[in-house]
Amino acid sequence: SRGLARCVESLAVSPNAPRCLLATAEGDEHTLGLLLAELSLREHGWNSQWAGRMTPTPELIARIESGGCDMLALSAAEASSDAERLRNQAFTLASACQAHDVHLVLGGRGLWPEPATHLPPFSRVRDFREFHELLARLQN
């Protein structure tokens, strides 16, 4: 994964480009999908900031509140089977993102909730095709 990280770092983007904060869900150590998402972001002209694996929700909220990102991409692998914890984290982060005009993307095959009217808005992507489509929509 270090080789992929070096590839990502080699892609130059404008300092004025939109910024995406990348992290895995609490309790999730799987970062390969997140590295691939970071590569996709760079290819679409986004700056990326790596929060890393198992970043606690309060730390992510502090970064959202500081104005340091336009998007938060949170990944959970299929092995992240604690659906209640993922739902709680998604709701908490969706509320913080909505309050600060940050787009939340929940990705991976973890047991994330589906977008619903009783939740603050977020995007749910299951694979890289859906992620590329989302990035293309956001560029327009």
Located regions from the model:
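A short helix->loop->beta-strand "cap" motif at the edges of active sites that frequently abuts
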Residues: 98-104
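Short, well-ordered coil/turn elements that cap or connect secondary structure elements
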Residues: 43-45, 99, 119-120
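Conserved binding/catalytic microenvironments
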Residues: 1-92
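Peripheral docking tails and interdomain loops at the edges
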Residues: 105-140
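Generic detector of intrinsically disordered, low-complexity, polar/charged segments
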Residues: 30, 104-105
